[in-house]
Amino acid sequence: MQLSVTHPCCRTLILLLVSNLLLWESEAVLPICSVRNGRCFGSFEELLERAVSLSEEISKKAFELFTAFDSQYAQSHQLIVKSLKKCHTSSLDLPKPGSQAMQTHPVTLLKLASKLLRAWQVPLNHLVNNLPSLKNVSPSILSKAKEIEEKSNGLLEGVKSILIQMQNGDTEDENYPGWSGLASLKSETEDIRLFAYYNMIRCEGRDTQKVETALKMVKCKISNENNC
């Protein structure tokens, strides 16, 4: 028996397909994939290529955000001359160039990228929610921060999917650095808040470059190139 598109079960299926499509588009994740158990699966090469491309977009946007914030606030409030605080992710570092990098397994690099992205989920959420409280903050700064948060969440889902394919199962690593900078973001003293934002945006930009580099190293290793 043929069913028309007006049949209840067909309408339900169509709505499900549309909702899945919108979910992946809104998270800026990998566009060519099938969804199983709420996760995105495509060919390994497609997932990795899209992840690298998305990491490049995030790094570029993070640089633009830092430049915009630095231009609007850093000079006038002398933020640059203050002692910068250590980033909460400073323990997560890339392998050193040379033999250490060459011997590092792709899964180790993917887990590093995943930890960095997970470590920034809470801070980025607070950044986006609290930035509007800054005096004279520009719409450009707000939109860039929001875009970084959305794309970073999407990239995390992509990295998870790649790890699942490489390890034949979900082996999510929950061990990532915590963040304790909320009190400074909510300080009643404007200079304290500005410095907290400045240091946070600086650290986030540094870590987006780490993620990008880690994913490019994975791509290089999978391609069996000898110079990575």
Curated annotation (Swiss-Prot):
- One MF term in the entry's GO annotations: hormone activity
Q: In which tissues is it expressed?
A: Expressed specifically in the placenta. Expression restricted to the junctional zone of the chorioallantoic placenta.
Record's PROSITE patterns?
A: SOMATOTROPIN_1
Per UniProt, the keywords (alphabetical) are: Disulfide bond, Hormone, Secreted, Signal
Name which cysteines form disulfide bonds: 87-203, 220-228
Which Pfam families does the record associate with it?
Hormone_1
Gene Ontology CC terms: extracellular region
Compartments in which it is found: Secreted
Could you confirm whether the keyword Cell inner membrane appears in this record? Answer: no
Xref: SUPFAM superfamilies = 4-helical cytokines (SSF47266)
- Signal sequence span is 1-28
In which broad location class does this protein mainly occur, judging by the first location in its UniProt entry?
A: secreted
PANTHER family from the UniProt entry = PROLACTIN-2A1, SOMATOTROPIN,PROLACTIN
The record's comment on protein family reads: Belongs to the somatotropin/prolactin family.
Question: What is this protein identified as?
Answer: Prolactin-2A1
Organism of provenance: Mus musculus
Q: Which gene encodes it?
A: Prl2a1
